[in-house]
């Protein structure tokens, strides 16, 4: 995830590509099975790693760029004022340097980032061209260029139309080839067919590992995610195109767990992946998929070209739970509930047979302004899903609950948003125990927002209004306190915040109040009636 210059939260700085820092010869990104096989075969044939600089899904460091490739500048700015969006960052425009220049001051509102070949070629081979990103030195000193580089990087995530990216680090060039093509079902089955031990490494010497206890009987049925949540980097690692195993391969692994895992009790802890309900969901058109530049197939709305039929997943659940020796199949992966709403039969199947009292889902927030920075659906989708969840739970004669997850201090979220979220939680009688505060992770779009205070989902401009970003520790703790409004340890902080916001109407001991009065003040009021001391 650090194949180009990336912001590092722990050092609060932009770090160089890990290729530079590690002095590695080559970096394979993603799951890399195909790239690893190709690399191994080529090395076995006697080739040097330096000769494999065009390997898809790999990044290398070059001292000199190939002369027969065309460079496309993603950041040509006529005046350091604003940067326009890049709907197609490698589209070739045949025009003179002055063509299309603004004629009035009002037209100077945006400065065109028109990619132009720099090697004096009027025509060029699109397959032998690369995009020049702002250098490490530039993105380190210019947050707007960092956001711009992040924007272009994410636009180049579709393996069927992505370009090679190049970023200079002093005198060296980091060359990032396009992402690997997704594995076919047969290849996925092959990857999962090896005789994995399903046990911790012997170096742990029998020590208990809580994380292992959670996943030792779980089965990965797919990889990839087309959700595009900005705080997550799964798409940049596993890809946006879903890669699914065959039903036979999955059933075979369940049977192997049943027969070989010591102490197996009959429960499969999860059938899932990055998301619970994206198994075999792909674009209906290969042609459209090959040219698509969307960052998400489900935001701001579910794409009309996306197959949303959950029946393969429903069928898999039914077969898995009827296997001899299998008492229960749980679904522990996060559910994309807006997608599930497209197939109520799936929701019914899930709620009736595969929820063990609680189902984890992740609305992340209630406020549209913040949700738009996360690329998450409206909270209305949650409300719709909850209605169906409660209905099917009642029909099954089960008392079951949703456990929603929320994030505090996400870029774009201010105290007003967190207050509204807190009131939403109180209205719905949620008292979250485990809550999370946003932390920037490499390559995530939200990390670009955090560092640059700009929104790379839209036009990146120097003079555009910055988005609110919470970096101060006290402010981050305050936002987290809104999520745990019911914890008395947070009441003093929340009372002070509500007073600063002019919302003292939410302080009191009635049901509609968010936090109670200060207990000290209340106890004093029993003895002091507010009359001045005559002495």
Regions found by a protein language model. Give the residues of each.
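Flexible glycine/acidic-rich beta-alpha junction loops that bind and position SAM and/or redox cofactors
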Residues: 2-3, 30-41, 62-70, 241, ...
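Glycine-rich beta-alpha loop elements in corrinoid/cobalamin-binding modules
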Residues: 1-169, 181
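Flexible, glycine-rich loop/tail regions that form catalytic "lids" or insertion modules at the edges
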Residues: 52-59, 205, 220, 359, ...
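N-terminal pre-triad scaffold of radical SAM enzymes
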Residues: 205-233, 258, 267
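Terminal amphipathic helices with adjacent charged low-complexity linkers/tails
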Residues: 49-69, 73, 128-157, 166, ...
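Conserved SAM/AdoMet-binding glycine-rich loop
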Residues: 256-403, 407-411
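N-terminal [4Fe-4S]-dependent radical SAM core
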Residues: 145-218
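Conserved, mostly hydrophobic/aromatic
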Residues: 25, 191, 225, 229, ...
């Amino acid at each position: 995830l650090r194949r180009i210059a990336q912001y590092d939260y722990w050092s609060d700085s932009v770090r160089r590509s890990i290729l530079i820092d590690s002095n590695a010869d080559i970096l394979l990104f993603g799951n890399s099975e195909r790239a690893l096989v190709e690399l191994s075969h080529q090395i076995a044939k006697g080739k040097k790693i330096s000769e494999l600089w065009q390997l898809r899904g790999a990044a290398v460091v070059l001292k000199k760029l190939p002369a027969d490739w065309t460079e496309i500048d993603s950041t040509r700015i006529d005046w350091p004022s604003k940067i326009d969006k890049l709907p197609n960052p490698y589209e070739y425009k045949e025009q003179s340097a002055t063509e299309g220049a603004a004629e009035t001051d009002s037209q100077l509102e945006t400065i065109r980032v028109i990619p132009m070949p720099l090697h004096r070629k009027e025509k060029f081979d699109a397959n032998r061209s690369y995009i020049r990103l702002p250098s490490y030195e530039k993105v380190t000193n210019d947050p707007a260029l960092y956001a711009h580089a992040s924007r272009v990087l994410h636009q180049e995530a579709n393996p069927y139309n992505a370009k090679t990216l190049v970023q200079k680090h002093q005198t060296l060039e980091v060359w990032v080839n396009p992402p690997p093509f997704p594995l076919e079902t047969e290849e996925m089955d092959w990857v999962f067919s090896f005789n994995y031990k399903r046990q911790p490494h012997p170096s742990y010497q029998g020590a208990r590992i809580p994380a292992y206890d959670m996943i030792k009987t779980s089965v990965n049925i797919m990889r990839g995610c087309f959700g595009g949540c900005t705080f997550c980097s799964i798409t940049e690692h596993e890809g946006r195109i879903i890669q699914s195993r065959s039903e036979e391969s999955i059933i075979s692994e369940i049977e192997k767990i049943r027969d070989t895992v010591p102490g197996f009790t009959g429960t499969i802890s999860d059938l899932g992946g990055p998301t619970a309900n994206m198994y075999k969901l792909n674009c209906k058109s290969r042609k459209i998929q090959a040219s698509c530049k969307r960052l998400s197939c489900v935001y701001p709305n579910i794409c009309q070209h996306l197959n949303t039929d959950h029946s393969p997943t429903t069928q898999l659940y039914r077969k898995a739970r009827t296997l001899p020796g299998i008492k229960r199949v749980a679904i522990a992966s996060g559910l994309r509930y807006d997608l599930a709403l497209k197939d109520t039969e799936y929701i019914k199947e899930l709620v009736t047979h595969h929820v063990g009292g609680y189902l984890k889902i992740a609305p992340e927030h209630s406020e549209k302004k913040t949700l738009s920075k996360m690329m998450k659906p409206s909270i209305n989708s949650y409300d719709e899903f909850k209605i169906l969840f409660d209905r099917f739970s009642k029909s099954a004669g089960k008392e079951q609950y949703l456990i929603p997850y929320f994030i505090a201090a996400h870029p774009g979220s201010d105290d007003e948003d967190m207050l509204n979220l807190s009131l939403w939680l109180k209205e719905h009688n949620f008292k979250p125990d485990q809550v999370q505060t946003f932390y920037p992770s490499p390559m995530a779009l939200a990390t670009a927002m955090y560092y640059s205070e700009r929104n790379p989902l839209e036009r990146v401009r120097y003079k555009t209004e910055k988005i609110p970003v919470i970096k101060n520790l006290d402010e981050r703790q305050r936002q987290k306190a809104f999520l745990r409004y019911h914890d008395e340890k947070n009441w003093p902080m929340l009372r002070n915040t509500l007073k600063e916001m002019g919302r003292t109407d939410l302080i009191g001991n009635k049901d509609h109040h968010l936090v109670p009065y200060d207990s000290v003040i209340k106890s004093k009021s029993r003895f002091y009636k507010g009359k001045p001391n005559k002495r």
